Amino acid sequence: MPPAVSSETSTIVPQQVIVHPLVLLSAVDSYNRSAKGTKRRVVGILLGQNNGDVVNVANSYAIPFEEDEKNASVWFLDHNFMESMNEMFKKINANEKLVGWYHTGPQLRPSDLEINNLLKKYIPNPVLVIIDVKPKSVGLPTNAYFAIDEIEDDGSKSSRTFVHLPSSIEAEEAEEIGVEHLLRDTRDASVGTLATRVTQQAQSLQGLGQRLTEIADYLRKVVDGQLPINHAILAELQSVFNLLPNIFSGPVVSEQALESEAQRAFNVNSNDQLMSIYISSIVRAVIALHDLLDSLAASKAMEQQDIKPTVQNGEVSANAEQKA
């Protein structure tokens, strides 16, 4: 399906908007800090990449925004703050460009078109993403929109309106790990059960198995000549393989021999680790016993010499008393 084009400006309308979890977390955090418990909404800027068909929203930041609840046409947006933030984000990551703006809605407002027109001075084709910070049903908390000029059939003056765009939540592997840790830390510990923990471990192992399968398929296609050799990817894989323990030192003879050798190497490694822990415990016990014997000897010597112990700077010292 070819991408849609707005009539007056000949602007390509994006076909999909991808929102990363970091954007959702930033919007919720800004809402909880400044607008929680009120009817106010939070407005912010979206950063990422726009290749025409797909808008990838990877980062965001909130901006000062005020509006009159009774009169929707009265609002204030601090564009000076936005300009200063843009300069700082350029220094952090030059690949993240201004792609649009967001607010916490949860629906379109009458002033959204005016705000969108203002932001066009800084963003050529801004995308609006409404983030529902308090969703009442299960589903995506985002709705994406794009402003176009709609021409009437009777030839009258065109009107500007928002069209809905498909949106999705996608994350890179590092973001997935971060979100999993965040959910694990915020989840009520009393609710967790053994079945829940086992399920989480099974899902993690399933994800790891899927990644390993993808790597094996890629290497197989490279060997068969279906894909070109990418030395950067091979270098990354080699660095991963170098972290694995060197289990086999001799020639490989059979699968059964491999299993027995792997089991033996694993047992030896486990025994070495347990031995290190055991020796460390013995050393700590000997040191503690040595300190105890020193303390007893010093105390006995003080009693025999009628020396009164004093403590200075955490150290025991003795001052002898003169006998009459």
From Swiss-Prot:
> What GO cellular-component annotations does this UniProt entry give?
cytosol; mitotic spindle midzone; nuclear envelope; nucleus; proteasome complex; proteasome regulatory particle, lid subcomplex
Pfam families, A to Z:
JAB (PF01398), MitMem_reg (PF13012)
Protein name in the entry: 26S proteasome regulatory subunit rpn8
Q: Which GO terms describe its molecular function?
A: metallopeptidase activity
Task: Quote the Gene3D superfamilies the UniProt record gives.
Answer: Cytidine Deaminase, domain 2
Q: Does the keyword Repeat apply?
A: no
**Disulfide linkage:** none
Origin species, per record, is Schizosaccharomyces pombe (strain 972 / ATCC 24843) (Fission yeast)
UniProt cross-references to SMART domains, sorted A to Z: JAB_MPN
